[in-house]
Swiss-Prot record:
Species this chain originates from: Streptococcus thermophilus (strain ATCC BAA-491 / LMD-9)
Lineage of origin: Bacteria, Bacillati, Bacillota, Bacilli, Lactobacillales
Top-level class of the enzyme under EC nomenclature: transferase
Positions with a binding annotation for Mg(2+) 2: D224, E225
Alphabetical list of Gene3D superfamilies matching this protein: Nucleoside phosphorylase/phosphoribosyltransferase catalytic domain, Transferase, Pyrimidine Nucleoside Phosphorylase, Chain C
Named cofactor requirement(s): Mg(2+)
GO BP term, pick one: L-tryptophan biosynthetic process
InterPro entries: Anthranilate_Pribosyl_Tfrase, Glycosyl_Trfase_fam3, Glycosyl_Trfase_fam3_N_dom, Glycosyl_Trfase_fam3_N_dom_sf, Nuc_phospho_transferase
Annotated protein name in UniProt: Anthranilate phosphoribosyltransferase
MF terms in GO: anthranilate phosphoribosyltransferase activity; magnesium ion binding
Amino acid sequence: MKEIFLQISNRQDLSQDQVQAVFDRILKNEVSESQIASFLMGLKIKGETSDEITGIVRALKSHATVLPETFTDAMCNCGTGGDQSYSFNISTTACFVLAAGGIRMAKAGNRSISSKSGSADVLEVLGINVAASPEILSKALDEVGLAFIFAQTMHPAMRFIGPARQALGIPTIMNLVGPLANPLDLETQLMGLYRVELQEIVANAIQQLGRKRAVIITGPDNMDEAALYGTNTYTLLEDGHISQHTFTYEDLGMEKVELSDITGGDAKENAEILLSVLRNEASPYLETTVLNVGLGFFANGKAGTIKEGVELARQLIADGSALEKLRKLQEVQV
């Protein structure tokens, strides 16, 4: 580690291979907590690069639990979190609608860290076994076209990094790595990101990881979701090209929804919100969900524009298809 620390202290970027080698040791519990904290803080001060992000992701995937069946067409819409918006579980709600639209969703997530209810917490209330075995996850992906991929189950070696992250108490490169470390080789991705200035770096990492198409979204006030107030900024990876764009609720012909109107609660309250959306009950929650689903369909290529994606989202909720996906997952991922 001495040579690595020296290189970082000289503000020299690390190669993918260097970072992957360091994390391979970390994930084998061969590096002390203080060294891990120093490494993460050093990268943060220097400024993280796409190669460094990719190196960590590849190390994590090499230590991840493997599913018995291979899927090459999956998508994830997991975000970084950490935006302090305290909104309801938007991407978790959206994943059922995306799956209803024919996209195989490998929805990664975790328990609450900075909010009252993480994706794992709300799905548990709904009777879904978030810690299901790899065999059950494969069955769900095959039969339902949707599975919840629990970070703690699929990345057990991450426990060696947790204490250092908690001791630091600030966002590090690990916040960027989480949504990218899905154990499946994703074809497409919608990733919420809490800092606009990191979008290009993350987009380059996503490209290196082999995604066919992806959108990285940062909402107003650095939300890691799209919102119906202010300006949303997204970076699109398409056909090997990376470009940045903006849009507002007015561009889509939608009504304004303030952040205070989509505040979430605890896991039980957020489960009720999720159900109300899938039942097509009119609310700011429904409007925010269809916006993010529309963006997901655009990220996947299922819709040519975000607006087309929003219309498809409305249809799938209105006809009960999205709610049916939840019912099927409740039957299979148990």
